Amino acid sequence: MNKDQFRGSHLYSAIQLVMAIAIVAALCGCQSTYYSVWEQLGKHKRDLLRDYVQDASKEQQKAKVEFKDALTRLKEITGFDGGKLEEAYRAVEKDYERCSDRAASIRSRIKDIEDVSAALFKEWEKEITTYSSDTLRSSSKSKLRETRQRYDALHTALQKSSDSMTPILARLKDQALFLKHNLNAQAIGALKGEVVSIEGDIQKLIAEMNTSISRADEFINGLQ
């Protein structure tokens, strides 16, 4: 191993160690240590907030596709004309599970955003008091106020779309269970009215997600 390889391997090991400490700190609930470790890697709270918002936006993009797929599957089943009903039920069940997992992932991203934004704003408020320049202090206060306003709009949109998933998931689960216990043409026919109703809910959810994604883009651009 040459010197460059030796230095590279040790740098990689050091980064792995620091990241491991960050993960342990997060699991133990010690946020200050968690953020401190990330700062050692060159990622400050502002950078983490940007990353978390981007992650949430990507998760919502995926959720849009998965909820649309679930709706498409239900529509196909209501027009089911013979074939293997057991396979149809399994497909609906998997759609529900995918949507449920995605919703849980989005809720987790929102929690990350809430935690790091609270820490960032607290730190920002504290640092504002250390300015000796009235002009710079006033400018920083104004920037903080604008950032908070954009954050509030983003958080409201994120929470609204996340909350809208809950009743839709409950209805998807109901339909999967109904099919499980009633694998016959009569049961399929009984779902038609439900599918028409849930279609409107999913379209509304997708519109809310689009709004949330737009708010995320606006917020990220404002952090540049």
Briefly describe each language-model feature range:
Residues K64, K75-S142:
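Long amphipathic alpha-helical segments with strong coiled-coil/leucine-zipper propensity
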Residues A25-G29:
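C-terminal motif of bacterial Sec signal peptides marking the signal peptidase cleavage site
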Residues Q31-C99:
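Immediate post-signal-peptide N-terminus of mature secreted/exported proteins
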Residues N2-M19:
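Bacterial N-terminal signal peptides that target proteins for export
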